[in-house]
């Protein structure tokens, strides 16, 4: 028996909507990363974009466990400006309470996806919104009950 390898014409993408209200960030990000890659499908092919399209709503209400949400000594995100001494930092709590709280989920998922051209294509299938409104109703997304899968997913 030969190993099955999907062709680009055989791939069917599905639309999912996930409500991130009171959901633990790391658990959500790892599940979304697997779904973006397509590893939940039996027809998974590593070199093709066979993952689904995912819409995450209520990103501003995602939960962090432990001391990660603490604004003073919580989870710190670093970036480098390119200049000497140009390391800037911000915390997850500041981002969640700031102007773009959806960036916390996008960064968590992006760091779990492969860092190449295929990973960039898979990340383009992720749509994150801070509140419950999204413009993808025409795609008729299926509701994915992430909170009901495991009691630890919800906080």
Swiss-Prot record:
Q: Which GO terms describe its molecular function?
A: mRNA binding; structural constituent of ribosome
Name of the protein this chain belongs to: Large ribosomal subunit protein uL13
Subunit structure as annotated in this protein's UniProt entry: Part of the 50S ribosomal subunit.
Coiled-coil residues: none
Q: Name one GO biological process term.
A: negative regulation of translation
A GO cellular component term found in this entry reads: cytosolic large ribosomal subunit
Q: Which family does it belong to?
A: Belongs to the universal ribosomal protein uL13 family.
One Pfam family name from the record?
Ribosomal_L13
Q: What is the lineage of its organism?
A: Bacteria, Pseudomonadati, Pseudomonadota, Alphaproteobacteria, Rickettsiales
Encoding gene (name): rplM
Task: Supply the InterPro entries for this chain.
Answer: Ribosomal_uL13, Ribosomal_uL13_bac-type, Ribosomal_uL13_CS, Ribosomal_uL13_sf
According to the UniProt entry, where is the signal peptide? none
Function, in words? This protein is one of the early assembly proteins of the 50S ribosomal subunit, although it is not seen to bind rRNA by itself. It is important during the early stages of 50S assembly.
For this protein, the record's SUPFAM superfamilies field holds: Ribosomal protein L13 (SSF52161)
Going by the UniProt record, its keywords in alphabetical order are: Ribonucleoprotein, Ribosomal protein
